[in-house]
C-alpha cells in the first residue's frame, strides 16, 4: 500500500541492487526492440511496403511488442517526442554494459545499440525519444 500512489505493481527481486539489475535487463531488451523496430521500418520503406499495414501485420504476430504498438505509428508520423529521452537511455545502456563487464558477460547487441544511441546523442538528438533512432538512418531521412 505504501507504493500505491506511484506504482501499479511492486516486485521484489532480492537484496539491494537487484532492482537496478532488473531495470538494466529491461533496458537491454528495449535496446534490441528499438534497433529491430528501426531496421524493420527502414527495410520496409526501402522495399516499398505500406508501413502502416506492416505495423498491423507484425503487431498481430510473433513480433508484437509494446514498442512496436506505441512507437511504430509515431515513427511513421515523424513524432519523436520523448516518452524516454535517448540521452537517458544511452546512460542506462552504459550502466548495463558496465555491470555486464563486472559479471564477465559479452553483450554484443547491446554494445551495438550503445554505439547507435551514442552517435544519435553526439549529433544533438539526445532530447528525442528512443524512437528517434530511426532518424539516424540515411535511407529513412532521404527516401
Spans of model-derived segments:
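Acidic-glycine-rich active-site phosphate/pyrophosphate-binding loop
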Residues: 1-18, 66-72
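Helical "substrate-binding/catalytic lid" subdomain
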Residues: 18-141
Amino acid at each position: 500500500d505504501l507504493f500505491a500512489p506511484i506504482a501499479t505493481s511492486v516486485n521484489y527481486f532480492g537484496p539491494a541492487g537487484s532492482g537496478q539489475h532488473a531495470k538494466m535487463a529491461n533496458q537491454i531488451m528495449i535496446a534490441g526492440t528499438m534497433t529491430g523496430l528501426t531496421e524493420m521500418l527502414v527495410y520496409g520503406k526501402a522495399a516499398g511496403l505500406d508501413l502502416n499495414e506492416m505495423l498491423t501485420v507484425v503487431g498481430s504476430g510473433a513480433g508484437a511488442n509494446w514498442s512496436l504498438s506505441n512507437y511504430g505509428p509515431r515513427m511513421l508520423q515523424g513524432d519523436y517526442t520523448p516518452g524516454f529521452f535517448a540521452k537517458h537511455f544511452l546512460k542506462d545502456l552504459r550502466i548495463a554494459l558496465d555491470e555486464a563487464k563486472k559479471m564477465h558477460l559479452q553483450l554484443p547487441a547491446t554494445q551495438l545499440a550503445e554505439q547507435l544511441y551514442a552517435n544519435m546523442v553526439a549529433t544533438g538528438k539526445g532530447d528525442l525519444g528512443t524512437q528517434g533512432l530511426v532518424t539516424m538512418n540515411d535511407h529513412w531521412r532521404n527516401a
